[in-house]
């Protein structure tokens, strides 16, 4: 399986990092070794002093697809979830300055937190989902999928032009504004439509 991530999919997040607004979805991939095992603490890697949380809505692909038409994209997933795209922001900044890929800053071990999955059918409108990230009990990120520049089905159609999607693949759909630094002993929790889907201790 592979983890396909979308960058710069919320306008306010683009502004907070002073990035240029893209004309097409920004796509990068995390290896499956980036998945943080369930119930395991996240250890800040030695190579970074500025790891940021980025909460994101996730979808899990249920069947093989290539060159998927947007109108059929909804048939390629049944589960929706929530996760964190941990980012070594200091390392990413150095890589961006040199025009190099971001993988070292986003694909390191444990950099992909994947919470519980919920049936897609349990939501009335995937284009209007509230989600939040709390740090030590306080809301630090609050988003709604209505603010996505490219919606879930658009992303599936776009990504499938370049990568064959396979059963079990996971798509991280982008983060809203409010990203920030984590420190040892922080406690993170994520909620989708009021349901807590993950909790996490930082070491």
Residue ranges of predicted features:
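Catalytic-core "active-site belt" of small-molecule-metabolizing enzymes
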Residues: 1-162, 166, 170, 178-203
């Amino acid at each position: 399986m592979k983890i396909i991530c979308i960058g710069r999919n919320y306008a306010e997040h683009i502004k907070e990092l002073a990035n240029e607004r893209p004309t097409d979805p920004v796509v990068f991939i995390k290896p499956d070794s980036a998945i943080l095992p369930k119930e395991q603490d996240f250890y800040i890697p030695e190579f970074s002093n500025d790891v940021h949380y980025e909460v994101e809505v996730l979808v899990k692909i249920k069947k093989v697809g290539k060159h998927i038409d947007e109108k059929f994209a909804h048939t390629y997933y049944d589960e929706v979830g929530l996760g964190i795209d941990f980012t070594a922001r200091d390392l990413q900044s150095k890589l961006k300055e040199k025009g190099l890929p971001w993988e070292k800053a986003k694909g390191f071990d444990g950099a992909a937190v994947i919470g519980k999955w919920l049936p897609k059918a349990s939501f009335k409108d995937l284009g209007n989902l509230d989600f939040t990230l709390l740090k030590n009990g306080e809301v630090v990120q609050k988003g709604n999928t209505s603010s996505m520049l490219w919606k879930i089905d658009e992303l599936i159609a776009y990504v499938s032009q370049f990568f064959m999607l396979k059963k079990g693949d996971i798509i991280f759909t982008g983060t809203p504004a409010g990203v920030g630094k984590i420190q040892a002993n922080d406690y993170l929790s994520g909620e989708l439509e009021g349901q807590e889907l993950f909790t996490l201790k930082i070491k």
